[in-house]
Regions:
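Trp- and S/T/G-rich repeat-edge/linker motifs of beta-rich repeat architectures
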Residues: 22-39, 66-79, 115-126, 164-172, ...
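Beta-strand-rich domains and repeat architectures in extracellular enzymes and scaffolds
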Residues: 32-57
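Repeated scaffold domains used in trafficking and secretory/extracellular systems
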Residues: 38-45, 78-86, 129-137, 173-180, ...
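Conserved Ser/Thr-centered positions that define the repeating blades of beta-propeller domains
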Residues: 61-65, 110-111, 159-160, 181, ...
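Entry beta-strands of beta-propeller and related beta-repeat scaffolds
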Residues: 49-53, 89-93, 142-148, 183-189, ...
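C-terminal outer-membrane/trafficking sorting elements
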Residues: 358-401
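Short glycine/acidic-enriched loop and turn motifs that connect beta-strands
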Residues: 58-60, 97-102, 152-154, 193-197, ...
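Blade-level signature of beta-propeller repeat domains, shared across WD40, Kelch, NHL, RCC1
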Residues: 324-357
Length: 401
């Protein structure tokens, strides 16, 4: 057989977290969550230069533009907060209910940034065996419009007056809900933990009136967590799962699922069996995609793609493990930084340093007759009959020209 000539751009994947300094920089919030009770999953928000973090002890903030800034207690002191939404001077906060009682006191409204607040939990929630709210989503252009998902009596509820009145949209009990940021008539709900071994995903294209099941588009037992939306192409979405990365190019109508252990490469077990809960397209360069997750008995991990989610680097891991399960609560972006909120701390990661550590580019020309080559879907290719494109060869991504 005539040797196949390859013009190869090799992207060398580094195997460790630390190449040039510490990649995961702890911000030292000083409030650990080593004991996960129920579904307590506090969230964070970036407002201008200020990071706001929900904790089991209230709402805290830090000025990200000032490296010397200290954490400040904003409000809701001593209250375990799941999430919050802001409309002008008002904050609507979701209190986590450790007691699993349905007596209310889990929807709090403040008019002064959380220094004082009142319980505005409506009777509709007290009368429906609802113990707390799993999640909250705010409309991207109408801040008084919110979605919440309830537990254990399932339901997605919508308010258009910042929590004064609510309307039930469905009986689902999702882990994640959200509006499409560029087309908020599109609403999604997904249950990352799977339901009866099926990957639970519903999408509404009319503001929650009609919901379409998308289970058949996804592998069983794959999981699907919070969806990230491309910043310029509204049709492109991406989400992590368990063992999988899920993508769609048509507004969620059809999905492609990439199994992360398909390739015969040395990091497949490091990406396998991780709950990849949070994904993000880079706000400035959406070819760069980030995925954060954790799992029982594993470090918190972060992986990166530089080709829009087609291929992924070997996961980087957070080097300070304090709990048997390093659960990841949230991931946000701020300028050139990723912010990851886990049980042990809030971590800051330089995007440029992450990309630099992910790939080192060398241009060489090589001839390999017996090289084992796979396409990006993990299928073994027959050497000598390859069209131009991207492939995996010897644990490296190569471009054949």
């Amino acid at each position: 057989m005539k040797p196949h000539r390859l013009a190869i751009v090799i992207f060398t994947v580094f195997a460790t977290v630390i190449v040039k300094g510490q990649l995961f920089k702890p911000l030292g919030i000083g409030i650990e969550t080593p004991d996960l009770a129920g579904d307590f999953c506090p969230q964070m928000h970036v407002e201008d230069d200020i990071l706001f973090v929900c904790t089991k002890q209230g709402l805290y903030s830090k000025d990200l533009s000032n490296n010397e800034s200290e954490w400040q207690l904003v409000g809701f002191e001593g209250i375990p907060l799941q999430n919050y939404a802001r409309s002008g001077d008002d904050i609507l906060a979701l209190r986590y209910n450790y007691e699993y009682s349905s007596n209310g006191n889990f929807m709090l409204l403040s008019h002064d940034n959380g220094r004082s607040y009142e319980d505005i939990t409506p009777e509709i929630f007290k009368d429906n065996r609802i113990n707390f709210f799993l999640n909250l989503a705010q409309h991207p252009t109408a801040p008084n419009t919110l979605l919440v998902s309830s537990y254990p009596e399932g339901g997605i509820y919508l308010t258009s007056d910042f929590g004064q009145t609510w309307r039930k949209l469905s009986s689902f009990t999702p882990d994640y809900i959200g509006f499409h940021p560029m087309n908020p008539e599109i609403i999604y709900e997904c249950d990352g933990a799977m339901t009866d071994w099926e990957t639970d995903l519903h999408i509404s294209y009319d503001g929650g009136q009609i919901w379409q099941k998308k289970w058949s588009c996804l592998p069983n037992n794959a999981g699907l967590y919070r969806i990230a939306f491309h910043p310029t192409d509204p049709n492109k979405w991406i989400a992590g799962g368990n063992k999988y990365v899920h993508t769609t190019n048509d507004n969620g109508l059809s999905w492609d699922s990439q199994r992360l252990d398909n390739f015969e490469i040395d990091w497949r077990y490091e990406a396998y069996n991780i709950d990849w809960r949070y994904a993000a397209y880079d706000n400035e360069d959406p070819d760069n995609v980030y995925m954060a997750g954790g799992s029982r008995g594993a470090y918190m991990k972060l992986m990166c793609s530089t080709d829009g989610g087609k291929t992924w680097n070997r996961p980087f891991q957070e080097p300070i493990k304090i709990t048997p399960r390093e659960f990841v609560f949230d991931m946000k972006q701020y300028r050139d930084k990723l912010l990851i909120y886990s049980q042990s701390d809030v971590y800051e990661i330089s995007k440029s340093e992450l990309i630099e550590q992910t790939t080192s580019i060398q241009n060489i020309t090589n001839t390999k007759e017996n090289a084992t080559i796979y396409d990006l879907g993990g299928r073994k290719m027959v050497n000598g009959k390859l069209p131009n494109g991207l492939y995996i060869m010897n644990s490296k991504k190569v471009a054949i020209k």
